[in-house]
Design a protein with these regions (language model features):
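Charged, amphipathic alpha-helical segments and their flanking helix caps
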Residues: 1-26, 46-126
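A short, hydrophobic beta-strand-centered structural micro-motif
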Residues: 37-48
């Protein structure tokens, strides 16, 4: 698969999820500066990878950011936990979708992924 095909497939999977409203590919700063994000959103950031002649394999690494807003006008701690819970569910759903049998024909997706919850005070706050 080409890099374009990989990105397009991830975009298709992300936007097929009923909770994801927006998908972008790029860096975090550009994503946050775009100003027209429809949350919950997914950002795909391509990271350094590798090409192995011996294994005849190209490894593409990326960071997948799942983002949503916390409504500060209601009980923010409970709302924040609810948002994190929803985003974790989305991540689990996407990991399962990456492993779909048809996709296994042309890509081998890692069995594990690291997760990290980030809290940022940004302009995109309610």
């Amino acid at each position: 698969m080409t890099l374009n095909q990989v990105v397009q497939r991830i975009k298709t999977i992300a936007l097929a999820h009923k909770q994801i409203n927006d998908f972008r590919e790029g860096d975090v700063i550009s994503f946050l500066r775009s100003g027209d994000i429809v949350y919950p959103a997914c950002l795909l950031q391509i990271l350094p990878g590798r090409i192995s002649k011996a294994e005849r394999q190209t490894t593409v690494r990326f960071a997948l950011y799942l983002c949503d807003k916390v409504d500060l006008s209601i009980d923010s701690k409970d709302n924040e936990l609810e948002v994190k819970s929803d985003l974790l569910s989305i991540a689990e759903d996407m990991m399962a979708a990456f492993d779909y049998p048809t996709y296994k024909l042309d890509w081998d997706f890692a069995d594990e992924a690291s997760i990290e919850f980030l809290d940022e005070d940004l302009e995109d706050m309610l």
